UniProtKB/Swiss-Prot annotation:
Pathway, per record: Cofactor biosynthesis; ubiquinone biosynthesis
Transmembrane feature ranges: 17-37, 40-60, 90-110, 113-133, 135-155, 163-183, 207-227, 231-251, 262-282
Organism: Legionella pneumophila (strain Corby)
Catalytic class of the enzyme: transferase
Entry GO CC: plasma membrane
The protein's Enzyme Commission number: 2.5.1.39
Biological process per Gene Ontology, one example term: ubiquinone biosynthetic process
Task performed by this protein: Catalyzes the prenylation of para-hydroxybenzoate (PHB) with an all-trans polyprenyl group. Mediates the second step in the final reaction sequence of ubiquinone-8 (UQ-8) biosynthesis, which is the condensation of the polyisoprenoid side chain with PHB, generating the first membrane-bound Q intermediate 3-octaprenyl-4-hydroxybenzoate.
Protein name per Swiss-Prot or TrEMBL: 4-hydroxybenzoate octaprenyltransferase
Catalytic activity: all-trans-octaprenyl diphosphate + 4-hydroxybenzoate = 4-hydroxy-3-(all-trans-octaprenyl)benzoate + diphosphate
Amino acid sequence: MIPWNAYVRLLRLNKPIGILLLWYPTAWALWMANQGFPSIDLLMIFLFGTVFMRSAGCVINDIADRHIDRHVARTQFRPLTSGEVSLSEAFILLFILLCASLLLLLKLPINCFYFAVISVLITFLYPFCKRFLNAPQLILGLAFSMGIPMAFIASGKNLNSDFIVLFLINFSWIIAYDTMYAMTDKADDLKIGVKSTAIYFASYDRLIIALLLIFLHSLWLVWAINKNAEWFFYLLWCTAAGILTYQLKLIYARIPKNCFKAFLVSGYYGLVMWFAVGLALI
């Protein structure tokens, strides 16, 4: 019998937050690059590409961490670690996902290919960075930001000031929310020697997260003022600021389950700012 349930969990399709956190910045970029009206074709290419590459990243991560995950309470029952999915099955799934992503890539301009290659290389590198890099979230930030330049190029736009602002917003956002995520596993990671910004930032973790959130949310104001955005953008911006404040409240006591909840709440921030960008460009 084919272990469909195990495959779904290996690809994290049962946990769509990862897909959403990769999709929202790409959607922001598509809306910015197309003045609020991206084509259906572009939307479908990038949406499916997001799902395929995020799932591929999960498979790569689980292959690399299969001997580590059994020592972490949250990950010890992942399909590869528990034996529900074999290593050969995981490689076959990875091959299928990469081929599907390549087929989508062929529909985009050639310059998108270069960023896609960078994205794949970083995706393969990231799990191993947790062994030797004190801040592997920096690598994750690059990997999860490659959809932004690809969206601009696919839309026929240069990598302009909008791109720079958005890239900085997303890069900072990723480091902030993934540090929250890493705070969930901090005790286990310290025992087994896995590195993360949650460990590297030490007692300054909450302060640095707060500074990153203030920085990136302020950049949205810079963008909005430059675009002469109407009042409804600022209303949604204030709503999103409330979400960030709630996240900071959740992580204040550094309770693992609350840190994980704070990470999940990031999805609401991405959604609200997607609406804000869309309305600002109408």
